[in-house]
Amino acid sequence: MLKVSRDSASQRQTAGPVVDLREELDGYTVSFTSLLVDIDATPFMKGLPDDRCQCPHWGYVFKGRMTARYADRDEVYEAGDAFYIPPGHIPVANEPGTEFVWFIPTEELRTAEAVMTRNMLAMPSGSTT
């Protein structure tokens, strides 16, 4: 049986104020994510097609609130919401302390994370958005 929990996730990634506990399951990354501060990810998306995340995400918000910006609208996801975030979005706002789980195709996530990591490393030390 393929399954994972926050406690059993074998990978821990911390990128500043973002903490991910994750596991790969049959081509998908299951990520239990905590957002410790409000973050606008716009600068991290530079270099992706349309400068937006092209990964689809399915998930559930346990606590807090987060916002995805599309070319034509913003969508807000709050505690208790199950969600689908299609390609072409930017995470632009969240309530500090927001926690959610999301499911992302692993190969698409790796492509996006390579660009985001490059952008984070190019930023002045200690800067956040």
Set out the residue ranges of the language-model regions.
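A short, N-terminal "cap"/entry segment at the start of jelly-roll beta-barrel domains
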Residues: 1-42, 49, 116, 124-129
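A short, polar/proline- and glycine-enriched secondary-structure boundary/capping micro-motif
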Residues: 42-44, 78-80, 103, 111-114
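Short histidine-centered beta-strand/loop micro-motifs
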Residues: 42-52, 70, 93
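Short, conserved beta-strand element in jelly-roll/cupin
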Residues: 51-68
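General beta-strand recognition
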Residues: 67, 76, 99-101
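Short acidic-glycine-tyrosine-enriched beta hairpin
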Residues: 70-88
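Charged, glycine-enriched surface loops/patches
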Residues: 73, 115-119
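Ligand-binding loop in jelly-roll beta-barrel domains
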Residues: 87-112
